[in-house]
Amino acid sequence: MQQLNPSEISEIIKGRIDKLDVTSQARNEGTVVSVSDGIVRIHGLADVMYGEMIEFPGGVYGMALNLEQDSVGAVVLGAYTTLAEGMSAKCTGRILEVPVGKELLGRVVDALGNPVDGKGPLNNTETDAVEKVAPGVIWRKSVDQPVQTGYKAVDAMIPVGRGQRELIIGDRQIGKTALAIDAIINQKNSGIFCVYVAIGQKQSTIANVVRKLEENGALANTIVVAASASESAALQFLAPYSGCTMGEFFRDRGEDALIVYDDLSKQAVAYRQISLLLRRPPGREAYPGDVFYLHSRLLERASRVSEEYVEKFTNGAVTGKTGSLTALPIIETQAGDVSAFVPTNVISITDGQIFLESAMFNSGIRPAVNAGVSVSRVGGAAQTKIIKKLSGGIRTALAQYRELAAFAQFASDLDEATRKQLEHGQRVTELMKQKQYAPMSIADMALSLYAAERGFLTDVEIAKIGSFEQALIAYFNRDHADLMAKINVKGDFNDEIDAGMKAGIEKFKATQTW
C-alpha cells in the first residue's frame, strides 16, 4: 500500500485551498437571517455599499442601510411577505434609480417611479439616482426671479423666489396643502414644471388633489409622487428623494421647477420607524441622530444653478440659461408647537417659513397666514417690482393692527388716529382673505394692493371689502384690459400706471356697484 508523506498531504491541501474561490461568492452573496416589519438581516455581503440595491429571489429588492461587522440590515422596497429565512441575497452594484423626464408630466407614480394611475406604462427609458449630491456654492446663483403663488398674503408679504426653500408650517387641517396646491395651479402658464410629493396621506386625499389639479388644468404640468399611508415606511422615506430627482431633471437642463413635499413630518416618522427597527440608538423624541441630515441633504438640492452649470451638465446643448428647483416643504405641528425637534430642524434649513395659525383659520381668515411670524429670507430680491412697491405698508398695517387690537380690548375710548389705524388694519385683514382654487394674476393683486395702499378702501364697509375687490377687478379687466395686460407682462410700476389705476378706481367708486 502506497504511503503518503505528511509534507505531500500538506501540499495537496494547500493546492486545494489555493484553487478554491470562496471570496467572490461570500463577499457578494449572503443569506437571509431574519425578516420582520419590512427589515431584513443578511449574513454575508461583505462587499455591499451603503444604499446599494440588494436582490432577493422573486424580483424583490432591498436597500442596505446598516453595515455591521458580520451582517447587513436592509429595508425591503415593496412587499416582504414572500421573503423567508435562509433565502439568498445578492449585491447588485447599483444604487436606487427612478425614471425622469417630461414623459412623467401628468402622471401619478409611486416612490420607485412605477405608474399607479391606470394610464399604462411610462414611455421613457431615462433614469437617475435617487440620492444625489447638491450643487456646490460655485455652481449656484442668487435668487432674483419670482415664483407667483397667486396668494396676496404670500406674494405681497412673504415672496418666494425661484430656487428658494420656503417652509409651510402649521397644525393639521388649516390649509397648508391648499396653499401649496394653489401655488401649483398658478404655475400652469408660467413655464414652471411642478412635482407634488404626497407622503403618508390617505389615498382618498391624494386622489382628491389629483382631481383638483386636473379640473384646474394644472395636472399636465405636474408629476405626482404618491407614497400613501398604506405604503411601507421605506417607500414613505424614499418618496421625497425620488420626487426631488424628477424635479432636478428640469433644473439641470435650464428649466424651472417647483416641488412640494407634503409633508416632511410623516417622512421623519417613517425614518424613525426604520431606524428603530434597525436597532439604531434613539435620540430626542426617539428620532435617530441623523434626522437633521435626512432633511438637509434633501432640501439643499433645491437651488438656482448658474448658466455654466447647465452648460456643463448638458455638454453645451443648453447655453445661457439658468435652472432652478424651488421647494415648498410642509411641516405639521402639534398644537402650534414650532419648537419641537423636526419643525426647528426644517426652519433652520429653509430660507423662511409661512406660518399658518389655527386661531386665524377658525376666525375665518383664510389663508390663515400669520404675517408677524412668517418670513422670507431671500424672496425680497425676487419680488415683482409693482408688488414690492405697493405692498410696503401692508405688513406694517397688519402688525400695528394686531398690536392695537390687543390694546383696544382694555381701553374704553380711543383717539382718532388709533381708531383709523384699527379700521385700516381690519380692512387690510379682510382684503388678504382669498378663496381656494382662485389664484390671482399680478395685475389683479396689484390693483387690490393699490386700493388699500392709497386709501381707496377707507369709506368702504368692512363687510363689503370682498365684494368691492371682486367688482373692482372685474371692472378693470373689462374697461381697462390694456392696462392690466401691460402690468401682467412687465410687472413695473410707473406714473402712467399710477394715474391709470387712480382714475379707474375713482370712476368705479362713483358707480357704487358693489
From Swiss-Prot:
It catalyses: ATP + H2O + 4 H(+)(in) = ADP + phosphate + 5 H(+)(out). GO terms for molecular function: ADP binding; ATP binding; proton-transporting ATP synthase activity, rotational mechanism. SUPFAM superfamilies: C-terminal domain of alpha and beta subunits of F1 ATP synthase (SSF47917), N-terminal domain of alpha and beta subunits of F1 ATP synthase (SSF50615), P-loop containing nucleoside triphosphate hydrolases (SSF52540). ATP binds at residues 170-177. It is an enzyme of class 7 (translocase). Its main location: membrane. Keywords: ATP synthesis, ATP-binding, Cell inner membrane, Cell membrane, CF(1), Hydrogen ion transport, Ion transport, Membrane, Nucleotide-binding, Translocase, Transport. It is a peripheral membrane protein. Transmembrane segments: none annotated. Disulfide bonds: none annotated. It is found in: Cell inner membrane. InterPro entries: ATP_synth_asu-like_sf (IPR023366), ATP_synth_asu_C (IPR000793), ATP_synth_asu_C_sf (IPR038376), ATP_synth_F1_a_nt-bd_dom (IPR033732), ATP_synth_F1_asu (IPR005294), ATPase_a/bsu_AS (IPR020003), ATPase_F1/V1/A1_a/bsu_N (IPR004100), ATPase_F1/V1/A1_a/bsu_N_sf (IPR036121). It comes from the Bacteria. The keyword Transferase does not apply. F-type ATPases have 2 components, CF(1) - the catalytic core - and CF(0) - the membrane proton channel. CF(1) has five subunits: alpha(3), beta(3), gamma(1), delta(1), epsilon(1). CF(0) has three main subunits: a(1), b(2) and c(9-12). The alpha and beta chains form an alternating ring which encloses part of the gamma chain. CF(1) is attached to CF(0) by a central stalk formed by the gamma and epsilon chains, while a peripheral stalk is formed by the delta and b chains. This is ATP synthase subunit alpha. It comes from Pseudomonas syringae pv. tomato (strain ATCC BAA-871 / DC3000). The lineage of its organism: Bacteria, Pseudomonadati, Pseudomonadota, Gammaproteobacteria, Pseudomonadales.
